Regions:
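Gly/Ser/Thr-rich loops at beta-strand to alpha-helix junctions
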Residues: 1-6, 69-71
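Active-site/ligand-binding-proximal alpha/beta "capping" segment
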Residues: 46-95, 143-145
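C-terminal functional extensions of proteins
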Residues: 95-152
Length: 152
């Protein structure tokens, strides 16, 4: 992934000697393989739908940073899967950067015009800090994962 936030996350994982997965899309004008991705875990896709399938399949949470059409496509795909309960696992969906997203997305208008339900606005969380994102993710995971020492 890259450039920007995705590249920084991958570089951080690499610097910490952690494994990380690269799910690249072959495009004529961008997205060369990130040199910090774990080589055996670097995959290239021709079709967007296959790339999105794998990142949703592997993810426990998705944090979406400001981006363009591809970012919006990924956000709405994940949100649709969560809304329609096509995912059989909980998924914390986070929009990072409230001021950006409030200008780009007017989901309240969709509620006003009846194209989405007001409850759909609860399918994701908008945040401005790492601490807010972390608290939301851990809260979502605690809803479904047993706590240490708990019996099943």
């Amino acid at each position: 992934g890259g450039p920007g936030v995705m590249e920084a996350a991958i570089r951080g994982a690499s610097d910490a000697k952690g494994l990380n997965v690269g799910l690249n899309i072959s495009l004529p004008h961008e997205q060369a393989a990130n040199p910090h991705v774990t080589r055996e875990l670097n995959f290239e896709f021709h079709y967007f739908f296959m790339r999105k399938f794998w990142f949703v399949y592997l993810a426990k949470a998705i944090v979406i940073f400001p981006g363009g059409f591809g970012t919006l496509d990924e956000f709405f795909e994940v949100l649709t899967l969560v809304q329609t309960r096509k995912l059989r696992k909980p998924m914390a969906v986070i929009l990072y950067g409230k001021s950006y997203w409030s200008e780009i997305l007017n989901l309240d208008a969709m509620v006003k015009y009846g194209t989405i339900d007001p409850a759909d606005l609860e399918l994701f969380k908008s945040v401005d800090s790492v601490d807010e994102a972390f608290a939301y993710i851990t809260g979502k995971m605690e809803e479904v994962l047993p706590l240490p020492g708990a019996s099943l």
